[in-house]
Regions:
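Dinucleotide-binding Rossmann-like beta1-alpha1 core, especially the glycine-rich loop
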Residues: 47-123
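Active-site/ligand-binding neighborhood in enzyme catalytic cores
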Residues: 108-233, 241-247, 251
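Conserved Rossmann-like nucleotide-cofactor binding loop
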Residues: 12, 35, 255
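Mid-domain catalytic core of redox enzymes
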Residues: 23, 224-329, 333-342, 346-347, ...
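Conserved flavin/dinucleotide-binding core of flavoenzymes
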Residues: 42, 96-97, 312-435
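Glycine-rich FAD pyrophosphate-binding loop
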Residues: 21-45
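General small-molecule cofactor/ligand-binding pocket signal
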Residues: 78, 218-222, 369-372, 404
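N-terminal Rossmann-like FAD-binding beta1-loop-alpha1 element of flavoenzymes
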Residues: 2-29
Length: 435
């Protein structure tokens, strides 16, 4: 198989390219944008500000991928333990909240503790039909309703009752009863996070990890696929060009990919249209001081707070900002299926700044030296109750017509950057095995 086409130049696309290179094949990669990176793109702005397309760090336990990425930045990376915190009704709560209840209203803490005891004493496992059931069964009603169910509406743009549980993995910590009580009675608790440590490039943002991969493929930017003739094996692009292929691997989001394919049947088109994904407006701010939030990520639960999550790029690498400055990257979530975007990205900037001041993150005396808003049409897969059967039908069709798929939006999975890279490798191996 000589002519391998890879659609997309993010982590998954370069995973596929790396596997092709290892197999002795030089692939051709196509991307609709004028830069590489996909959802892991980085942007360097005048004045010394660097922002990624969302808060990306490398925390893989896969030593092979870890070594590969480290080599790509010549060992020049920051290594740190993650810090996360939560904001709820004026309270700053160490993450995860379930073992850091100290200082919250006594009546609330009492109810949560009693229900955690009930959960621990339970002898029968309750039926779990959806994510809400799982939360109530795991943490009791009060904690579930106060924290994760509220965050779900802000982050996933729909209710926990409308989500399945396929995506949870290690994301929500299920503590021992002793941990819950200790965190309620004492102001200090053990650091608990599903990420034990992360790496981030010294310079160039997260996308610096990808730059050396450019030499292993022929990369054609500004090539947006609009049609795939899988019978003749030809890709057609918006710019009027076309390209034949012997095999193709795509990281294009499934709802975008399926309508491009000649002869896609109605049931598959309908299934692809049912797949839900959040979109996000990211507001990036540069501030004239660095002591903003002592955390890499902060989760905001209150629905009247405009945004959902805030990260601090200057704590990932000090080279992301000019000397003496700090930066905030603020995520505001929408989805076409559940919460349609109702404003221009730039219209989010002032509400974000206002609520950062209301929460105490920004002071009235702070100078905002840089401000920028971008709309990202695909953010996180929403695992609603239609997802599993719809994704299975779409993947079956792609297998039938010989189009490989990979990454978060090809596998339609809640996977991280290293998992996306491996997904691309696996898709390429599958393609070669079937040739």
């Amino acid at each position: 198989m000589k002519r391998i086409a890879i659609l997309g130049t993010g982590m998954a696309g370069f995973g596929a390219a790396h596997a092709a290179h290892t197999a002795g094949v030089r692939p051709v990669m196509y991307d609709m944008h004028d830069h590489i990176g996909g959802h892991t793109s980085s942007y360097e702005f005048p004045g010394g500000w660097t922002f990624d397309e969302g808060p990306h760090v490398s925390f893989t336990d896969n030593d092979r991928v870890k070594d590969l990425l480290a080599a790509n930045v010549a060992g020049q990376y920051v290594e740190a333990r993650p810090k996360a915190t939560n904001y709820w009704k004026g309270h700053w709560i160490k993450h995860p909240a379930q073992i850091n209840l100290h200082g919250l209203p006594a009546e609330l803490v009492t109810k949560i503790l009693l229900e955690f005891v009930d959960v621990a004493r339970r002898t029968e496992t309750p039926a779990v039909r959806n994510y809400e059931d799982w939360l109530r069964a795991s943490f009791g009603n009060t904690f579930a309703e106060t924290f994760p169910m509220e965050y779900t509406v802000k982050y996933h743009t729909t209710t926990a009752a409308n989500l399945n549980t396929d995506w949870i993995g290690p994301r929500l910590y299920r503590p021992k009863l002793e941990e819950v009580f200790a965190g309620a009675l004492h102001p200090k608790s053990d650091d608990v996070h599903y990420i034990s440590g992360f790496r981030y490039p010294n310079h160039g943002g997260f996308a610096a990890y990808l730059q050396p991969f450019r030499k292993i493929a022929d990369i054609k930017l500004g090539h947006q696929v609009v049609r795939i003739d899988h019978k003749e094996r030809v890709l057609h692009f918006k710019n009027g060009s076309s390209a034949p292929y012997d095999g193709v691997v795509s990281s294009i989001p499934l709802p975008e990919l399926v309508p491009m394919i000649d002869g896609a049947p109605r049931d598959v088109l309908d299934a692809a249209a049912r797949l839900a994904c959040s979109e996000v407006v990211i507001v990036s701010l540069g501030i004239d001081r660095a002591d903003l939030i002592d955390a890499h990520w902060t989760y905001f639960y209150d629905r009247d707070i405009f945004f959902t999550r805030v990260s601090t790029p200057h704590l990932q690498s000090p080279n992301n900002v000019p000397p003496g400055c700090g930066s905030l990257q603020v995520e505001c979530y929408y989805s076409s299926k559940y919460r349609p975007l109702d404003r221009r990205p730039e219209d989010c900037i002032e509400p974000v700044i206002a609520d950062l001041k209301r929460c105490g993150v920004l002071r009235e005396t702070d100078r905002v030296l840089f401000r920028h808003a971008m709309h990202i049409p695909y953010a996180n897969v929403i695992f609603d109750l239609e997802t599993a059967p719809a994704a299975a039908l779409v993947h079956g069709f792609l297998n039938d017509v010989g189009i490989g798929y990979c990454g978060r939006y090809g596998d339609w999975a809640y996977i991280w950057t290293d998992q996306s890279f491996v997904s691309g490798e696996n898709a390429l191996h599958k393609l070669l095995a079937g040739s």
